[in-house]
Amino acid sequence: MKALHFGAGNIGRGFIGKLLADAGVGLTFADVNQTVLDALNARHSYQVRVVGEQEQIDTVSGVDAVNSTSEDVVTLIATVDLVTTAVGPVVLERIAPAIAKGLVLRKAQGNERPLNIIACENMVRGTSQLKTHVFNALEEGDKAWVESHIGFVDSAVDRIVPPSASAAHDPLEVTVETFSEWIVDKTQFKGELPTIAGMELTDNLMAFVERKLFTLNTGHAITAYLGKQAGHQTIRDAILDEKIRLVVRGAMEESGAVLIKRYGFDDAKHAAYIEKILSRFENPYLKDDVERVGRQPLRKLSAGDRLIKPLLGTLEYGLPHQNLVLGIAAAMHFRSEDDPQAQELAQLIADKGPQAALAQISGLDANSDVVASAVNAYNATA
């Protein structure tokens, strides 16, 4: 099997690329970072530090790389068996035209072998969104062929991959936690289902997408926002602060109550899942900066993301949400000179006030009780 992976960043190399290469898949990375591309093509290998109670260094080998803006990408899409991405939600739209061109070339060459495309992004149904962008770039006459020959497979991914401390010396070295989870929707594949160690197949993906979003992502974000407010530098420092831990655990329990109601997750198993997440945040070997985790607060406060979506679930089922509200208020306080969204958030609050700003960002009713609660919490910590 041959695969093209868009995104040779830390998550691409440390998570999806590593799983594919470890499974014996012939792997080519596509990226725009020339330093990384040159290093991959010079060495055809890189090292991954897997850190936990026992640290190990794994070597990923047999890889190469192409520039994602080059015609090489188009040619590869016409021949490979799998395309994956780890580029960030915003970049999916940018890579879609190249994917569309590659699919048209594949059709022109008469290659009718099934091709499956999997976006491995921190978003709900990311591949379905990528498919929309790809279809927008296709001519009408090509859409039916793509629909019948190309699988667009949604997935849920989970692995904490902070920036590597040694990246300044070696652009390829990456540090990851031991835990990883890659769950894919088996109902969306074309052709035979692949067998790749570390890839789990399910016919109930949304349950796992929301479990991860409402627990790992919700908890991670709230830890970062409360940690930043309290002057902590890392996620570990923040989660070891008992006041913060209480709110984070409470928020994950509130979002968990939504998951249990919606999908029938087992109470005890979900409680254990929350404990596992908290222990991952405590990992002393991951230097995960609160500012990195908190960046892009406008996206994280949007209706379909990690703070507002679980809150909407609590409103839907009439469940408690006071800790989620505290997390939302902390997100509204997030400031970073290096993050344009943090600056835009600050400007929006300055121009419109916290009530109208939160309503605009989140889609919540400005006059609702929950917005009033969030604004009160925001003002209480101003």
Curated annotation (Swiss-Prot):
Any Pfam family hit: Mannitol_dh_C
Single GO term (MF): mannitol-1-phosphate 5-dehydrogenase activity
Keywords: NAD, Oxidoreductase
Annotated residues for binding of NAD(+): A3, L4, H5, F6, G7, A8, G9, N10, I11, G12, R13, G14
Gene Ontology cellular component annotations, sorted alphabetically: cytosol
Single Gene Ontology BP annotation: mannitol catabolic process
InterPro entries in alphabetical order: 6-PGluconate_DH-like_C_sf (IPR008927), 6PGD_dom2 (IPR013328), Mannitol_1_phos_5_DH (IPR023028), Mannitol_DH (IPR000669), Mannitol_DH_C (IPR013118), Mannitol_DH_CS (IPR023027), Mannitol_DH_N (IPR013131), NAD(P)-bd_dom_sf (IPR036291)
EC number per UniProt: 1.1.1.17
Catalytically driven reaction(s): D-mannitol 1-phosphate + NAD(+) = beta-D-fructose 6-phosphate + NADH + H(+)
Coiled-coil boundaries: none
Main EC class the enzyme belongs to: oxidoreductase
Family stated for the protein in its record: Belongs to the mannitol dehydrogenase family.
Protein name per Swiss-Prot or TrEMBL: Mannitol-1-phosphate 5-dehydrogenase
